[in-house]
C-alpha cells in the first residue's frame, strides 16, 4: 500500500512539472532602438522688411501739386508674436507757383516708432509719431474672428505754438464680412483740451465724423492684387463757442461725403513688392450757426501714394 502511495505521488510530481513547463512561456529579451530626432528651433526673427513710400495729398483750391507731400523710409521686423516698425522721413508742400521760387518748401521731419503684440484673434500696440511742430501718441487695438472684426486708435496730439492739444479716437467697433465684402461703421472724434482751439470764426471744442465704410477685392492675380474701399459720410458735427457775430462754420451735408480708394499691390517676386493707392473725395458742405462765403472751397480732395517693400 505504501509502495502504491509513493508511486502515485511520484507520478503527480512529474505530471505537475511537465504541465508547468508547457504553460509558462519562455521569456525572450527584446532590444528597443531609440531614435533621437534633432529639433530645429524656431528662428527668433521671422522676417525683416525695408521700403520707401511717397504720398501726395491735396485739396482743391490749394497747392497745385500737393499741400502735403510725405516721403518715408521704413523698416519692419517681425517675430513670432511681435511686429516692430521704425520710419523716418520728410513732410513738405509743393507748388509750381511757389512764392519762394522753388517747387517745394523746406517742410518738417517725421519719425515713427511702433510695436504691436499679436495674440490669437486680437492685437494690442503703441505708436509714436514725432514731427517738428507736434507729436502724436497712439494706443492701438483690434480683433478678427473671421466674419466679425474691428479696430481702434486712441490718440493724443501734443502741439506747439498757438495750437491746443487734443485727444482723438478713430474706431470701427464692429465690421461684418459677407463673402468677399466687408462693411462697418467708422467714427472720428476729437476733443480739444482747455477752452478749445482758437479759429478765425470762434473756438472749436469738439468734432465728430460718422461714416459707413465698405471693402471689396477687385482683382486677385498671380502677381497683381487690386481692392476697393468706399466711404459714405453719414453725419458731421462741430461744437463751437464764442462764434463771431453772423459768422458760422461749415460741415458736409448728411450723406453728402463720398470717397473712393483703389489699392494696388504688384509682386515682382517672392520678396519684392510695389504698392500704392489713389483716393478721391467729393463733399457738399452747408453752413451752421451763421453764414459762410466759402461753402464750395475744398469740396474735392485727393491722395496718391506709391512705394516699394523688400522682405528678407
Feature-to-residue mapping (PLM):
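Outer-membrane beta-barrel "beta-signal"
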Residues: 266, 296-312
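Detector for outer-membrane/organellar transmembrane beta-barrel domains
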Residues: 148-249
Amino acid at each position: 500500500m505504501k509502495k502504491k502511495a509513493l508511486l502515485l505521488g511520484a507520478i503527480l510530481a512529474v505530471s505537475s512539472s511537465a504541465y508547468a513547463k508547457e504553460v509558462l512561456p519562455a521569456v525572450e529579451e527584446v532590444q528597443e532602438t531609440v531614435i533621437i530626432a534633432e529639433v530645429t528651433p524656431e528662428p527668433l526673427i521671422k522676417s525683416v522688411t525695408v521700403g520707401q513710400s511717397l504720398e501726395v495729398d491735396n485739396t482743391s483750391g490749394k497747392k497745385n501739386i500737393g499741400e502735403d507731400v510725405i516721403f518715408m523710409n521704413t523698416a519692419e521686423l517681425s517675430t513670432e508674436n511681435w511686429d516692430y516698425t521704425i520710419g523716418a522721413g520728410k513732410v513738405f508742400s509743393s507748388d509750381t507757383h511757389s512764392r519762394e521760387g522753388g517747387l517745394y518748401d523746406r517742410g518738417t521731419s517725421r519719425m515713427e516708432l511702433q510695436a504691436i503684440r499679436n495674440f490669437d484673434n486680437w492685437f494690442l500696440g503703441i505708436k509714436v509719431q514725432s514731427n517738428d511742430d507736434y507729436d502724436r501718441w497712439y494706443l492701438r487695438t483690434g480683433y478678427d474672428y473671421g466674419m466679425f472684426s474691428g479696430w481702434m486708435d486712441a490718440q493724443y496730439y501734443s502741439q506747439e505754438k498757438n495750437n491746443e492739444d487734443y485727444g482723438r479716437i478713430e474706431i470701427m467697433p464692429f465690421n461684418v464680412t459677407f463673402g468677399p465684402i466687408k462693411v462697418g461703421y467708422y467714427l472720428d472724434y476729437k476733443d480739444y483740451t482747455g477752452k478749445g482751439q482758437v479759429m478765425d470764426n470762434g473756438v472749436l471744442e469738439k468734432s465728430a465724423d460718422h461714416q459707413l465704410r465698405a471693402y471689396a477685392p477687385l482683382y486677385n492675380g498671380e502677381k497683381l492684387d487690386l481692392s476697393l474701399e468706399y466711404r459714405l459720410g453719414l453725419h458731421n458735427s462741430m461744437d463751437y463757442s464764442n462764434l463771431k457775430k453772423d459768422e458760422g462754420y461749415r460741415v458736409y451735408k448728411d450723406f453728402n461725403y463720398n470717397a473712393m480708394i483703389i489699392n494696388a499691390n504688384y509682386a515682382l517676386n517672392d520678396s519684392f513688392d510695389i504698392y500704392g493707392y489713389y483716393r478721391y473725395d467729393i463733399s457738399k458742405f452747408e453752413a451752421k450757426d451763421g453764414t459762410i462765403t466759402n461753402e464750395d472751397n475744398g469740396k474735392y480732395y485727393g491722395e496718391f501714394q506709391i512705394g516699394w517693400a523688400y522682405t528678407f
